């Protein structure tokens, strides 16, 4: 492989990055609107939570959102970074979230990592991890 091939492989995929940013916005909107159809499309069937809903699968999470057990009023991302590795994308950064789980207010500042994969032309979330940053 010559250096021109390496340059082409290392070049950012701006189209995929744009698509992932849009998918990430659609995720936030679907949560806030409790849009079952959109969540079913955005979330992969083999979706898993790393935290805070570990153990919930796609169906359980969507049911909780639609029923109002999980209520997301807003997600305001900051410092979002997108990385693309072929058909896999990582979206990570921080966000201020206004949300509730049952009667608990879990609003605050979070760090997040969302893993997407492109399937049949659509980016779908396959894994999600949230954590509260430790303050020093």
Q: Could you describe each region identified by the protein language model?
A:
Residues 2-41, 46-136:
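A beta-strand edge to alpha-helix "cap/lid" segment located at domain peripheries
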């Amino acid at each position: 492989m010559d250096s021109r091939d390496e340059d082409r492989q290392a070049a950012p995929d701006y189209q995929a990055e744009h698509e992932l940013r849009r998918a990430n916005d659609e995720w936030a909107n679907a949560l806030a609107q409790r849009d079952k159809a959109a969540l079913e499309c955005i979330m992969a069937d083999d979706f898993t939570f790393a935290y805070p809903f570990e153990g919930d699968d796609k169906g359980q999470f969507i049911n909780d959102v639609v029923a109002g057990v999980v209520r997301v009023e807003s997600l305001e991302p900051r410092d979002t970074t997108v990385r693309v590795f072929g058909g896999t994308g990582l979206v990570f950064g921080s966000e201020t979230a206004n949300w509730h789980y049952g009667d608990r207010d879990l609003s605050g500042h979070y760090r997040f990592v969302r893993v997407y994969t492109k399937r049949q032309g659509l980016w779908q979330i396959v894994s999600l991890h949230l954590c509260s940053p430790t303050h020093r």
